[in-house]
């Protein structure tokens, strides 16, 4: 009996040891990584989809039936080819070919380059799409007729015919930091979220593509360490008020070998955030936007195969939208026939769905109300339904809906209270629903078009069970008032036993950038467990969505226009004062932490709110909007020449004299997004004002500051800072 008790005690001690929630467990193991359904690819007939699975150490692309949730066969297995590692794949419409990307190498946030191989499902041969000695390719994509693949290499556009694998070079003038064909420049990739710059026509006989002339864009240099002599990485980065790339749109005819330019007009200081082919034969739609990003025109050009040499293309304006502030670029445009398109707009004060007849300009609003449509998934011609995601129940949640374009009747297709995302079959008879909430990881279900659950694909039962061992607290969703009496959405995480005598330190987590929320009823990954670990140390953790954040209508989101940082800072200060008045919060020990825009916010709060905040952590912060890229900055601030006063008034570098508390500044030296320059200029001002602070740089790390033991080191450093300044 005694030995048995000793054994039980030993087991309990072991369990206790391994159930200690700490940074090592969070950041250097895969203990808390949720399972997911990987590589979902709806197949052409609408009855099947493919998914990526790891089985017995090999990667497999599996074909599934939606109706039966049954494996129908393995389309491709890496074990047949020496377990070749691939990171992405595409299946041709006829399922004859599979395109896989290997040895993928990141370039910037969205972009990468790979060696691409194409697999013939009939003869089971795997071939490189091009001579690998010429370098890696980018953005490879099948033509709609399944006979060709287009791609970019070294800033030039190419395609191959799959019948003979002959490579055809479309452009020849591509040059790094000078001319880009078929891809986008840095600022388009970052701020318009596109890196692909070519698009097949519906018939597969033409390719429309971007041409970026970067020659007049100023160059930014980053030092890269790790060698005896540091090297310089150079790329074109247009900062606020500076020159952009000159943009051209060309259409290449594969049969005539001719390239025809799309006339964008005389004004070259414009943006072209999207191009796409309509359902009309040979009609290209170009989205043209002015530099202030408050006027958007949709232009049409027809490119007929039999067009005589040197004949220009007639350009027609199909649609125009303007704003007194700015317009968001979205991917909700769907051409449903030769005359009508689905469109979303904030023109009535909230983001809603419209049907636009682009022949005569007539429009019909399909959804309305004091809520925002967040994404449009597609249009089902058979039942006249548009499928979409919306923050209809709350700005903190997302649901899946359908709406009939004739009756305007809306049906709810999801049932989980939290965040729902959908991947629809090509015939819209089925969709895979990805659901999570603030305290539970992803739950995948296969549903029919009415939302009825047909099958459960992944429930993350193992992770949920594991989480029970750590006695985690719940995120509580609340509202807090700002100085003007506006109720702001927030969440709070509190220790199970609150100490109203000694009280608790508070850490506020902030982002606060335009349209971006941190108060979401969804799974938030590893930061969720880090916050939980702080709660176990006695911290209260909270986050507040200030003015300027999303899904509360245009007025709320656009209230920070021309004055970034002003109202957001006031709201965070108001929230800190509110929390400080709670009987379990030590108002002398309030800290704030943010990354990127959040680092900008935490830097403003510790200076402008010096009497409220005791400590602040700023990771990779913008410290002066003059240092940031022009598309983002000018969208919300206009140019420094037009709005210089507000650039300066709300820049942290101009408020360091107010600093009283503890300030930790962290940045990666190879941050291509928010340049290391921002932190160095902040350091200069802090030194000039004789302010004590902590500063740490991660050599050769980008905006994400990760790789190897980097994240563990970073979070250990932040833990030590918080414990030293908020707990002692």
Where do the language-model regions lie?
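Short loop/turn segments that connect beta-strands within beta-propeller blades
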Residues: 66-68, 120-124, 162-165, 253-257, ...
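Beta-strand C-termini and the immediately following turn/loop, strongest in propeller blades
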Residues: 50-56, 65, 90-91, 99-110, ...
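Predominantly five- to eight-bladed beta-propeller fold
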Residues: 29, 69-72, 103-108, 112-115, ...
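Non-catalytic accessory segments flanking enzyme active sites
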Residues: 34-41, 47-61, 73-75, 87-90, ...
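Signature of short aromatic-glycine-proline-rich micro-motifs recurring in repeat-based ectodomains
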Residues: 34-40, 84-90, 183-203, 274-275, ...
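Beta-propeller domains
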Residues: 211-363
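Blade-loop segments of beta-propeller domains
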Residues: 69-96, 100, 105, 133-136, ...
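Serine-hydrolase catalytic core recognition
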Residues: 219, 273-276, 281, 287, ...
């Amino acid at each position: 009996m005694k030995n048995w008790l000793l054994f039980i005690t030993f087991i309990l001690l072991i369990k206790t040891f391994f159930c200690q929630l700490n940074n090592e467990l969070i950041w250097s193991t895969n203990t808390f990584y949720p399972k997911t359904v990987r590589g979902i690819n709806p197949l052409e007939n609408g009855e099947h989809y493919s998914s990526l699975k790891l089985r017995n150490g090999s990667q497999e692309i599996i074909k599934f039936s939606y109706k039966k949730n049954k494996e129908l066969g393995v389309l491709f297995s890496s074990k047949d080819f020496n377990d070749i590692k691939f990171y992405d794949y595409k299946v041709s419409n006829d399922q004859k070919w599979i395109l896989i990307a290997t040895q993928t190498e990141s370039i910037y946030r969205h972009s990468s380059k790979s060696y691409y191989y194409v697999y013939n499902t009939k003869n089971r041969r795997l071939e490189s799409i091009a001579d690998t000695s010429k370098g890696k390719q980018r953005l490879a994509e099948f033509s709609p007729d399944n006979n060709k693949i287009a791609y970019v290499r070294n800033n030039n556009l190419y395609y191959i015919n799959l019948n003979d694998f002959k490579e055809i070079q479309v452009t020849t003038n591509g040059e790094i930091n000078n001319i880009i064909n078929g891809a986008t420049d840095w600022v388009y990739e970052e701020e318009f979220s596109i890196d692909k710059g070519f698009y097949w026509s519906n018939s597969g006989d033409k390719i429309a593509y971007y041409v970026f002339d970067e020659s007049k864009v100023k160059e930014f240099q980053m030092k890269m360490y790790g060698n005896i002599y540091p090297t310089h990485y150079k790329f074109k980065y247009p900062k606020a008020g500076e020159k952009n790339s000159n943009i051209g749109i060309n259409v290449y005819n594969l049969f005539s070998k001719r390239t025809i330019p799309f006339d964008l007009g005389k004004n070259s200081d414009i943006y072209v955030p999207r191009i796409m082919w309509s359902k009309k034969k040979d009609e290209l739609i170009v989205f043209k936007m002015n530099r202030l990003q408050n006027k958007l025109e949709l232009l049409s050009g027809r490119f007929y195969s039999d067009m005589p040499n040197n004949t220009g293309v007639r350009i027609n304006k199909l649609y125009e939208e303007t704003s007194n502030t700015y317009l968001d670029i979205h991917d909700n445009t769907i051409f449903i026939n030769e005359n009508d398109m689905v469109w979303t707009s904030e023109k009535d004060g909230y983001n809603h769905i419209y049907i636009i007849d682009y022949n005569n300009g007539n429009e019909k609003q399909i959804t309305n109300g004091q809520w925002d449509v967040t994404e449009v998934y597609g249009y089902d011609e058979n039942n006249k339904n548009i499928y979409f995601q919306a923050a209809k129940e709350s700005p903190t949640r997302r649901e899946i809906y359908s709406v009939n374009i004739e009756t305007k009747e809306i049906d709810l297709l999801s049932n989980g209270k939290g965040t729902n995302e959908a991947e629809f079959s090509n015939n819209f008879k089925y969709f895979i629903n990805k659901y999570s909430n603030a305290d539970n990881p992803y739950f995948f279900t296969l549903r029919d078009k009415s939302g009825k659950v047909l099958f459960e694909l992944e429930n993350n039962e193992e992770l949920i069970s594991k989480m029970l061992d750590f006695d985690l607290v719940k995120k509580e969703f609340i509202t807090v008032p700002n100085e003007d009496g506006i109720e702001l959405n927030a969440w709070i995480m509190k220790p199970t036993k609150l100490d109203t005598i000694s009280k608790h330190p508070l850490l506020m987590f902030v982002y606060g950038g335009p349209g971006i929320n941190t108060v979401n009823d969804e799974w938030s990954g590893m930061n969720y467990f880090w916050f939980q670990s702080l709660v176990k140390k006695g911290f209260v953790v909270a986050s507040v969505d200030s003015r300027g954040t999303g899904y509360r209508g245009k007025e709320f989101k656009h209230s920070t226009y021309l004055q970034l940082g002003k109202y957001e800072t006031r709201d965070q200060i108001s929230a800190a004062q509110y929390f400080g008045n709670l009987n379990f919060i030590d108002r002398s020990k309030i800290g704030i932490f943010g990354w990127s825009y959040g680092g900008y916010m935490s830097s403003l709060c510790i200076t402008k709110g010096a009497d409220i905040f005791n400590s602040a952590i700023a990771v990779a912060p913008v410290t002066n909007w003059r240092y940031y890229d022009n598309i983002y900055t000018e969208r919300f601030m206009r140019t420094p020449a037009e709005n210089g006063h507000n650039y300066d008034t709300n820049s942290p570098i101009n408020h360091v004299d107010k600093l009283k508390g503890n300030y930790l500044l962290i940045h990666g030296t190879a941050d291509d997004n928010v340049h290391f320059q921002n932190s160095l200029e902040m350091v200069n001002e802090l030194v000039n004002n004789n302010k004590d602070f902590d500063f740490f740089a991660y050599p050769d790390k980008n905006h994400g500051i990760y790789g190897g033991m980097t994240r563990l080191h970073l979070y250990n450093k932040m833990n030590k800072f918080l414990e030293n300044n908020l707990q002692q």
